[in-house]
């Protein structure tokens, strides 16, 4: 390796070392020189329809491969992406946002140039991003540029959240030392003197538990403890649930897995069992209202051991600066030697289950009270499944997942439209892993997207990117004439919850899909059975799209149905009192 290289070459070499194979984005005059170095560095350039979609796609890519990256231009481009960057921050996707900026001379002279507020101020956009990224750097000096890049990327890895790198156009080809590339970016976790004390208290709680259970949340992925948590579940054989965010990270085929815990919305026997537990091992908590069924699924603190990034809570006592991965690894080793609570007989607790078409009249119209447990039969090992914010996001929580599957479901940010470009990014990451034989031995892996019509209209352009890259994506579009999730919450008869009626199955052709690309529509169970039985849909390649037509008030069982029922009950009460409410 030469002793020096161009700054852009250094940046892209580092990204390749982190496992990044593709960079998303949109070209703009302040990043064009930077883009010249993407493909020579061995990276694939993915040009998206707009910067928002590019950032969504980089997020989806990051959740599968660990790190994603996008490049935008200064001002207009980066602000278009910032909503998605905020979502990645909230739900902990490690996205590197690289922004091409005006030359240093223009910034220093405060020139009034395009893509600015025309006031000579160049730092506002970076200040905005400081609120939604964990580290930011503006490269100004070739002598310090490589260290700045490494420091920011280290924080991206350590915290699994977005970072922000500004590259002035006049620094792109500046020579920098290459020596640092000979070593990977070093990660240093704090080691607390109290590790043994924490571990001893955890072991004591586990040994004395009489009704223990396990609750797994989605932050085990960025924490890097998915494997350890799975081993703990396997060894203890204790009843296990996930939150919506945690679903899809575990092996759901084991007998002690019971699906998503819905708190007060769950079956009475499940809610009672959790409430009566004397120990809850909670891994990777992300306790937002939308991830905990309005906070009702949060376990009682006094019986909970909660494992977060660098903190363990044992009951109401908090131990800070604790390396959680080390603790969970120690726990895996110790469990085999402990006398654990063994459920014999095992408690009678419901598990997720599929439905069969044999149990349903094929002439009946589709309805979401049964749809999702039937669609579960379509899923294959290794599928990446995405359920968009809306009825689809609630529905996919009901689906038992096969081995090695992943699930993206609404968690906290809930920006509708995310899942379509997110599916593009996830499918691309999936293909890169299969091509390098790193995907569980599966060769024909699929990405399966469930999305409502309203969300689809937000980001439909990324069908074109999926088609251009020939990604293996199956799209199930829920056509319910608008925002049914909003109808359930408020205004179920109001026009503001309607959307334009599109001919959705013409979209693949419009966006350039090859002639013969599969599209199909189902209104009845019989029509859906025929579609799901098609080899072309199940085992084909490239884009396939299926429209599922349901009623405008149709929703999966659970909170949405209850919200709608309460809304209608209030309306009946208002009418009985001689008033009228929407």
Predicted regions and their residues:
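Thiamine diphosphate
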Residues: 98, 106-119, 226, 328-329, ...
């Amino acid at each position: 390796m030469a002793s020096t290289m161009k700054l852009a070459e250094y940046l892209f070499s580092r990204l390749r070392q982190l496992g990044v194979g593709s960079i998303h984005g949109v070209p703009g005059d302040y990043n064009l020189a930077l883009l010249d170095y993407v493909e020579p560095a061995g990276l694939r350039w993915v040009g998206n329809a707009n910067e928002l979609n590019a950032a969504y796609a980089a997020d989806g890519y990051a959740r599968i491969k660990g790190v994603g990256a996008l490049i935008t231009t200064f001002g207009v481009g980066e602000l278009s992406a910032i909503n998605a960057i905020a979502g990645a921050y909230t739900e902990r996707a490690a996205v590197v946002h690289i922004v091409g900026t005006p030359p240093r001379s223009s910034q220093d002279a405060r020139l009034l140039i395009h893509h600015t507020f025309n006031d000579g101020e160049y730092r506002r956009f970076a200040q905005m991003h400081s609120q939604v990224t964990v580290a930011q750097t503006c490269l100004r000096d070739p002598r310090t540029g490589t260290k700045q890049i490494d420091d920011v990327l280290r924080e991206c890895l350590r915290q699994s959240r977005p970072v922000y790198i500004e590259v002035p156009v006049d620094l792109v080809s500046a020579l920098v030392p290459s020596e640092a590339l000979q070593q990977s970016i070093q990660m240093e976790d704090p080691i607390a003197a109290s590790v043994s004390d924490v571990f001893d208290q955890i072991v004591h709680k586990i040994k004395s538990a009489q009704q223990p259970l396990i609750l797994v949340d989605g932050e085990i992925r960025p924490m890097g403890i998915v494997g350890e948590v799975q081993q703990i579940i396997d060894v203890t054989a204790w009843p296990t649930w996930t939150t919506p965010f945690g679903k899809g990270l575990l092996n759901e085929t084991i007998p002690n897995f019971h699906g998503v815990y819905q708190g007060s919305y769950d079956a009475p026997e499940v809610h009672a069992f959790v409430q009566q537990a004397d120990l809850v091992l909670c891994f990777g908590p992300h306790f937002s209202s939308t991830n905990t069924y309005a906070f009702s699924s949060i376990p009682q603190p006094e019986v909970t051991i909660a494992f977060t990034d660098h903190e363990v809570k044992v009951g109401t006592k908090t131990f800070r600066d604790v390396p959680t991965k080390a603790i969970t690894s120690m726990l895996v080793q110790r469990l085999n030697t402990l006398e654990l609570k063994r459920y014999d007989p095992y408690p009678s607790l419901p598990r997720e289950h599929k439905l069969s078409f044999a149990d349903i009249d094929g002439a009946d119209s589709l309805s979401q009270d049964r749809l999702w447990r039937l669609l579960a039969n379509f899923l294959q090992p290794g599928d990446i499944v995405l359920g968009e914010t809306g009825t689809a996001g609630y529905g996919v929580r009901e689906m038992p997942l096969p081995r090695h599957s992943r699930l993206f479901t609404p968690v906290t940010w809930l920006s509708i439209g995310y899942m379509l470009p997110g599916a593009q990014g996830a499918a691309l990451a999936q293909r890169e892993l299969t091509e390098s034989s790193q995907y569980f031995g599966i060769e024909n892996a699929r990405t399966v997207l469930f999305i409502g019509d309203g969300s689809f209209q937000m980001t439909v352009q990324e069908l074109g990117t999926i088609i251009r890259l020939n990604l293996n994506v199956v799209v199930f579009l829920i056509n319910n004439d608008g925002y049914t999730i909003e109808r359930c919450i408020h205004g179920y008869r109001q026009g503001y919850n309607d959307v334009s009626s599109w001919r959705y199955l013409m979209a693949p052709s419009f966006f350039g899909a090859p002639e013969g690309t599969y599209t199909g529509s189902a209104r009845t169970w019989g029509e859906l059975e025929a579609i799901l039985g098609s080899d072309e849909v199940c085992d084909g390649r490239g884009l396939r799209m299926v429209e599922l037509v349901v009623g405008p008030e149709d929703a999966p069982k659970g909170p949405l149905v209850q919200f709608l029922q309460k809304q209608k009950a209030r309306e009946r009460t208002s009418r009985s009192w001689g008033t009228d409410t929407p």
